[in-house]
Amino acid sequence: RALAGGANTFISVFHLHGTDLFMDFFNSIRDASRGAGAYTDRYVMYPPMANLLLWLASRLFPQEYLDTPGKYAGTWHYYPGAILAFLCLFAGVFLAFALVLLREPYSRKKRRALTVAVLFSLPFVFLYERGNTVFLALIFLVIFVQNYDSESKVAREAGLLSLAFAASLKLYPAIFGAVLLTDKRYKEAGRCVIYGILLLVL
């Protein structure tokens, strides 16, 4: 579609036609770099775990950029350090998601086709442009689904931890815990809730 319609068709996929490029990510990084001030000064709504990871990531960004007034948040492209930090973080998360998808129980050819189809689908391309932490949460949500019916107790527990971690980043993945209740796996649901509370509090 983009090849047929040209540049205007391509950028129409993105938020505000690409004029707010990657700003979910950069705004969040700038907010989280304030530490506790992210809540007291910036009034952010991200859960603590998400802000902790964003704060750690902010350590890679030039302090000069992080300290600029809010109206200059979109000037990240003037800072080579900010560009390189973003590219490295994005590449790491992208690779992690690809590796998780390649664990799907299909033939090698189907796994590769699935990975390419998912990672280059329209919703994911839009998600890349926003740079939102939902991408990271989705990785752990997929791990939960992959291990849900595993015969290994360790794998199932890893799945529960992954669901709890996903919920500690974005909250709404917690709704997938309803699957445990539907299958009457109450003990596992209880442990998942405990994991989630600990990750939210700690």
Where would I find each of the regions flagged by the language model?
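TM-lumen/periplasm interface segments of multi-pass membrane proteins
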Residues: R1-K109
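Short acidic/glycine- and proline-prone juxtamembrane loop motifs at membrane-interface regions
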Residues: F126-V134
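Membrane-interface alpha helices of multi-pass inner-membrane proteins
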Residues: R156-L181
